[in-house]
Amino acid sequence: MAAPRAHPAPRPLALVTGASSGIGEALTHCFARAGHDLVLVARSVDKLQALAAKLKAQYQVAALVMPADLASLEAAQRLARSLKRRKKIPDVLVNCAGVLEQRPFVHMRAADHQAMIDLNISALTAMLSHFLPMMLARGSGRVLNVASIAAFQPVPSLATYAASKAYVLSLTESLSEELKDSGVSITALCPGITATQMLSHATQANQQLGKLPHFLIGDVHEVARQGFEACMAGDVICVPGVINRAAMLASRSTPKWLLRRVGGLLARATS
């Protein structure tokens, strides 16, 4: 009598927000290449469907498209409920959805500031609130929060954005201790200026950004690769690029008043 055929082990599942472009899209390739099935979350259905088809064809993985506007307070809860009903609890949660506005604070509308807070802070917090308990109940999981090099110092003309990313970094560091010995790790990816659609939009608003030397602009695929590797290794903080790491270390040892002064000079020089 033939032995019963063993069922192949299910592939790990990675949920990526902000998956339709930039670092988020690049990260979907990293996880798919490593054999993860994907849940793709962003607002654009067309972009997500095109990405899902590409991932399936290139890596032979499953890719579930779940369009959502995470700026809506209920969106994270709806995602969690839907995946729970499907018995699809992510092994990896990647919080990459975000928005950037580069202008002096008073030149922006209150709605612009609120949009950054809603997506960069509130949506990320809601995703963690709904998905971390599932991972803890299972006893395993990984989280990758996309912050920014701007999280380490004040950045005039990026005041709200930098503050929102400082929140992400601080929250990640705090949770890394709360989650110790739980089987769940959490990582903050803190990229510098990266060649993405977000940078293109910022450059349209401020043409001086387009004059930055190429060596200061990170490659999106390399940033994603380093973030992926840090997440899988359980590192708490990942700062891609030698220059960015040097800037991060300098910011942690430089007096706050001097950081503010230098930031102000740079903001005026690029305004």
Regions picked out by a protein language model, each given a short descriptive name:
Residues 20-22:
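Conserved glycine-rich cofactor-binding loop
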